[in-house]
Amino acid sequence: MKKNTKKIVTAAGIAAGTAAVASLSAYVTIKALIDTALDREMPKVMEKADKRISGEKSSDEFTNRMESASESLAVQPNETVEIIAHDGEKLVGHYFPCEKPERVIIAFHGWRSSWHRDFGMISDFWYKNNCIVLYVEQRGQNNSSGEYMGFGLTERFDCLDWLNWEIERCGSDIPVYLAGVSMGATTVLMAAGLQLPPNVHGIMADCGFTSANAIWEHIAKDNLHIRFGIRSAIADRMCRRKIQVGSKEHSTVEALKHTHVPVILVHGADDHFVPVEMTYENYTACTAPKDLLIVPGADHGMSYFMEPEKYENAVKAFWAKYDRPRCEA
């Protein structure tokens, strides 16, 4: 009996030790993922994992065009503006006026990106179509302050701060559109669930994800081949500690169920970073007037590059419908 008891105790000890190691491994893995997602500085251990995280398969032609357009926009004359956000963070924007403005676009870039990188290619189209553009530097990135990014959870409120600035600068008569790419698209779609001023005539969202939790699960499972499941609770707690809001607390789907602001959704059908199914979810949930453009063969953020004419025609048709004053429901 004593030998059997000793074996049982030993086996139990090994099992407990194995479970503890597995639990620690899960914690360390998910911490690296959440630190990468939210921290201003990319953790050194993840610096070489960019391609695995995004799953992108962009061509050299796209990369070269994007870099050239980014460099060109970055050096164009503009007015650098600063505001203090609702929570005290300093936010930076770049204001591009035009001679005969027909509308204002407030543009929000994506995760670990920049205003001139994400909007370099489309900037000429906006300018030639009489748009004043305010390119925002998202919190926790580049010249805006903030220790963390928020995957739209915190940035959605920054939309209101920038809208207040825009109304002071341009008045409330000119139509305003919120635009975003990737996390910037999620930012403006989550903002759709807030009480937006009536001069916001539309939202233009390119390849946005539905929620922080949903995109983290996709990246973990499909791109990094890490089981997420139970780890989502750990991720949620870590997120809440960093930015005071949980990763499951808000989503674009819920926001779009309660908005009256017209929306145009764009997505590449071959997106490996943010699956196109997320845009279909957003489109189905949206109760406001809505347009949809899916670009075959386009990976993440490549829709304008792949089909510029279709993209421009869809956007111009959207403006033609909604430049007029918006009626509140």
Segments predicted by a language model, with ranges:
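Short alpha-helix in the alpha/beta-hydrolase fold that links the catalytic acid
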Residues: 252, 261, 275-284
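Catalytic active-site module of serine/aspartate enzymes centered on a nucleophile-bearing elbow/loop
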Residues: 306-329
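Conserved alpha/beta-hydrolase
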Residues: 125-145
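Catalytic nucleophile-loop/oxyanion-hole region of alpha/beta-hydrolase
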Residues: 115, 141-174
